[in-house]
Amino acid sequence: DTLNETAELLKNYNVGVSKHLIDVSDKEAVFALPQKVIDEHGAVDMVFNNAGVALSQTVEESTDEDWDWGLGILLHGVINGTRAFLPHLKKRPEAAIINTSSVFGLLSVPTQSIYHVGKYGVRAFTETLALEMKMENSPVEVYSVHPGHIGTNIANYGVQNERLDIDLENEDEVSNLFGPRAK
C-alpha cells in the first residue's frame, strides 16, 4: 500500500515513476529491472535504492543465515541496484543515485550489528561511488541519506530479540539507551 501511495504522491510532480516489487538480494532480478524501466519510460534519470530489514539480536546470537539475509538486503541490494542501473544513468545528461543509509550508519547501539554493518556499508559504498563519478567527470551525482526513525513497517517484518524492549517514541527510554545526545 505504501508503495502505491508514494507513486500517487509523485504524480503531482509531473515525473515518470515506476514501482517494482522485487527481492533486492536477488541479483538476477535486480539486473533485469533496468530494461523494464527503459521499456516503460525510454530512459532512467534517477535511482533511489531504499530497502531495509530489522534484526535485533546480539553478535553472539546472530547466525550466518541472519548475516547473509540481512546484508543481502541492506548492503548487497544497494550494490546490485547501483551496478544494474549505473551504465544507463551514465548515458544521461544529468542523473542521480540516492541510497538510503540510516542514522544507524553514523552511530551504533547494542543488538543491531547486522543493521549497522549494512547501513555503514551503504554509506561507505555511496561515498566511494560519489568520488569515482567525480573522478570520471560523470553526469551521475551520488548521495546517501541518513534518516532517523520513520514510521514504516520495517520493525513489523524484522527479526527481533525480546530483550531490547523499548518504546522508540519515549524520549527517556531512547536517551537511556543511546545517551543524552539522543534527545
Where are the model-predicted features located?
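Active-site helix of classical SDR
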Residues: T82, G118
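The beta1-alpha1 cofactor-binding region of Rossmann-like NAD(H)/NADP(H)-dependent oxidoreductases
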Residues: L21-A32, D64
